[in-house]
């Protein structure tokens, strides 16, 4: 019986693909070596310990229907589109070794005619006339008895969009999380015009088989039916939830300030696990009572645009004469935390 397993996803849903990855990783026998090939439609994928409000322009992502997905490995934020080919290598310990999977990807690139090399902690680069250019970034996860190495290859990604979503507006965030490392990148199509996702997957698959001296049939994972993986439904529900993607952010503080016709407002939030643990309001408004009441209502509130709006608009019952001010405040807060 082969010790290899090859899975290929035909879904572009990041939450689906990351849930598949998690389920395979949890239930695989320690003697198995797994290759999972996949790709995502427009998504910002952040590391396990990252703060999406710091790493991403969440407002623009919402406007452009770009999803946020938190992975279970560490590392920085990256933008995925269908121009990225994603790979995951898994193995039990002591065999798990990220240098093995790195060499498999390098061999695959070499077979395609691209000479690349490992650089730094998790990148693959090619040499160009303008200097080294990154074509792949990776992250890793290990448990007591197994590990995985996953990453992306930039095939024909829309690099102009990276700055749209990974360079957020300057917010006054004092974060305790991890700030992403920005790198100079290039697409494989700059080196191999016309190269396709299918060709890259085939090269990685053949390099995988060659390394282990075995072959195995590919298993196609499709969203058309629930994958036959233990606890997949529960894992997908968690992976796609606000509580996981946003609520797992490290503790941080956020200062919002704006001047309205009726006065200036400063809001200071301390946020932990997606909930406001402290809210302070400062204003030169001639009627500060609604804002003072708002600070109390926001304590313990989810740090989510719709919840902030809900708490703000609830004050209309007690302060109907300030309806205009409260609605302006509500709209501003919702836009500021997206």
Curated annotation (Swiss-Prot):
* Role: Catalyzes both the ATP-dependent activation of exogenously supplied lipoate to lipoyl-AMP and the transfer of the activated lipoyl onto the lipoyl domains of lipoate-dependent enzymes.
The EC number on file is: 6.3.1.20
Give the Gene Ontology MF terms in alphabetical order: ATP binding; lipoate-protein ligase activity; lipoyltransferase activity
Q: Which domain of life is it from?
A: Bacteria
The entry marks the following residues as binding ATP, namely: 71, 76-79, 134
Q: How does it assemble?
A: Monomer.
Please report the stretch or stretches of sequence annotated as the BPL/LPL catalytic domain: 29-216
Q: Which residues pair up as cystines?
A: none
Q: Which InterPro entries match?
A: aa-tRNA-synth_II/BPL/LPL, BPL_LPL_catalytic, Lipoate_ligase_A, Lipoate_protein_ligase_C, LipoylTrfase_LipoateP_Ligase
Q: Tell me the GO BP annotations in alphabetical order.
A: protein modification process
Which GO cellular component does the record give, naming just one? cytosol
Q: Which family does it belong to?
A: Belongs to the LplA family.
Q: In the UniProt entry for this protein, what further remark is given in the free-text comments?
A: In the transfer reaction, the free carboxyl group of lipoic acid is attached via an amide linkage to the epsilon-amino group of a specific lysine residue of lipoyl domains of lipoate-dependent enzymes.
**What EC class is this?**
ligase
Reaction(s) the record says it catalyses: L-lysyl-[lipoyl-carrier protein] + (R)-lipoate + ATP = N(6)-[(R)-lipoyl]-L-lysyl-[lipoyl-carrier protein] + AMP + diphosphate + H(+)
Q: Which Gene3D superfamilies does this entry report, sorted A to Z? A: Bira Bifunctional Protein, Domain 2, CO dehydrogenase flavoprotein, C-terminal domain
Positions that bind (R)-lipoate: 134
PROSITE patterns under this entry? BPL_LPL_CATALYTIC
The protein's predominant localisation is cytoplasm
What keywords appear on the UniProt entry?
ATP-binding, Cytoplasm, Ligase, Nucleotide-binding
Q: Where in the cell is it found?
A: Cytoplasm
Its protein name is Lipoate-protein ligase A
Instruction: Please name the pathway.
Output: Protein modification; protein lipoylation via exogenous pathway; protein N(6)-(lipoyl)lysine from lipoate: step 1/2; Protein modification; protein lipoylation via exogenous pathway; protein N(6)-(lipoyl)lysine from lipoate: step 2/2
